[in-house]
């Protein structure tokens, strides 16, 4: 913490916040994922080699070889430049990132780094730069998050990128979703209540959560599957949270029998 704060010194973000606020936020994201201490330390240090006078040798001496290698790994991923917008090149670039991430924690730090940068993207003044970063996120980092099983991270990366890459489509879908939301919110609550009653009747203690599907996911169905928004049957997603694997199978059976 102290080493990173001193190394970044008076550096500023586009938001005019101290630069150190960025690695601190990245560390917070990874802490929320309950990752290990080495990963959190790497998050705090991840920009020091690239953006400050700190060296690999200094980090290795102070924090050990493992953390130094992880920080160096994040630095090398950051140095890669994605320049093509073709699907084939995007897939090749994703494969390259995976191949270079001999420790999956390095990739997780990079994904958390990108997530915080997307959360603060609006502070960048040039629209072309915002669009480029968002496009890269949509083509590279969101699919990577999905590939390693980080579904919620993927959803947020897609949601943050969508309005910058396809602003007109985003505005159109959001207007239609807001209209549908006003007319279907009661349906979501009714489904949750009905599911809770069914599980209670079968002596299962569960938590049922419902959410509206992500705008980008809906747009992909419209664009690539030619399914209009009004004809999409899964605008809501429901999650049933149980205590263990056995209850999970019991809950699945209850739903299938309903």
PLM-predicted stretches and their roles:
Residues 1-237, 241-258:
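Active-site helical microenvironments for divalent-metal-assisted chemistry
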């Amino acid at each position: 913490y102290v080493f990173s704060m001193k190394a970044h010194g008076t550096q500023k973000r586009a938001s005019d916040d101290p630069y150190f606020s960025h690695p601190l936020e990245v560390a917070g994201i990874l802490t929320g994922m309950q990752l290990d201490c080495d990963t959190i330390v790497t998050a705090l240090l991840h920009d020091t080699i690239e953006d400050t006078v700190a060296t690999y040798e200094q980090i290795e001496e102070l924090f050990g070889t493992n953390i130094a290698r992880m920080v160096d790994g994040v630095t090398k991923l950051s140095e890669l430049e994605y320049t093509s917008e073709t699907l084939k090149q995007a897939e090749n670039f994703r494969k390259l990132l995976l191949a270079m991430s001999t420790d999956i924690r390095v990739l997780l730090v990079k994904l958390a780094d990108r997530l915080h940068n997307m959360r603060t993207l609006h502070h960048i003044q040039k629209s072309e730069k915002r669009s480029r970063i968002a496009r890269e996120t949509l083509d590279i980092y969101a699919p990577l998050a999905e590939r390693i099983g980080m579904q919620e991270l993927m959803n947020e990366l897609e949601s943050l990128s969508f309005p910058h890459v396809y602003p007109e489509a985003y505005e159109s879908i959001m207007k239609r979703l807001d209209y549908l939301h006003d007319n279907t919110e009661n349906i979501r609550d009714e489904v949750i209540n009905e599911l809770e009653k069914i599980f209670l009747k079968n002596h299962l203690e569960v938590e049922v959560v419902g959410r509206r599907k992500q705008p980008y996911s809906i747009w992909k169905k419209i664009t690539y599957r030619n399914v209009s928004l009004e004809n999409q049957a899964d605008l809501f997603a429901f999650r049933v949270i149980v205590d263990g694997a056995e209850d999970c199978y019991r809950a699945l059976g209850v739903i299938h029998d309903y």
